[in-house]
Amino acid sequence: MTTPRTGKPWRHLLVWLHVVSSTAWMSGAAGLAILLGLSRSDPALAGAAVGAARHLDVFLLAVAANASASTGLVLAWTTSWGLVHHWWVAAKAAITLVQLYAGIAILSPVLDELVAGGTPAPAAQVAGAAAMASAVAFQAWLSVAKPWSRTPVARRERARGRTKLPPAGTPLVAAGVLAPVGDVALTVALGVPAPLLEVVVLGVVGVARRRALTRTAPAAAAPAAPAGAVPPAPAPRGS
């Protein structure tokens, strides 16, 4: 049986991996902005700068972003904070998803075109990379300050008698640690970002936690007896 003590090392590893990957994501985005800015300031270095930026994007920024997102979501799902029970957690998750979409659908394709043409980066590309680094820094502040109140979801659960979410078991937490490590190996082997294990683990953790929380949901409180009602007499004891 899993106890809080046996699961603690895995939870510490998950928090550590989230901090490290988030720091790498922010640093990679800042480095990307610098390289893209260099391609604009010196046309002679444009090809080399955007080439280096693409390698940074594929082998650091994308890997770190995927790991930061997956570990952050697993942390939210498997701890008492919950994913949609506190506004600061929900805000971090929303910002992360927006950044992943922007990186995958906008920034990376443009970067591939720049490498193919050896052309300087447009100003919007530099601004996008800088905005990504700033957004990760803001998320770090949210983790430290934990501003704002509980969400309506948390208030409804509190009204039903659940004041705190129970933590998940060790297997789910351990999966959240091991999946990013496995995907790093896949990325190195394939040469492209491959968050396959992280996507699978997120699906498993999300479904498992939803089922577990549904099973342990507190029963609705019984209606209060009307004023003046006589309580039932106790049943007679057997001889």
Where in this protein do the model-derived segments appear?
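Polytopic transmembrane helical bundles with strong interfacial aromatic enrichment
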Residues: M1-S41, A48-S239
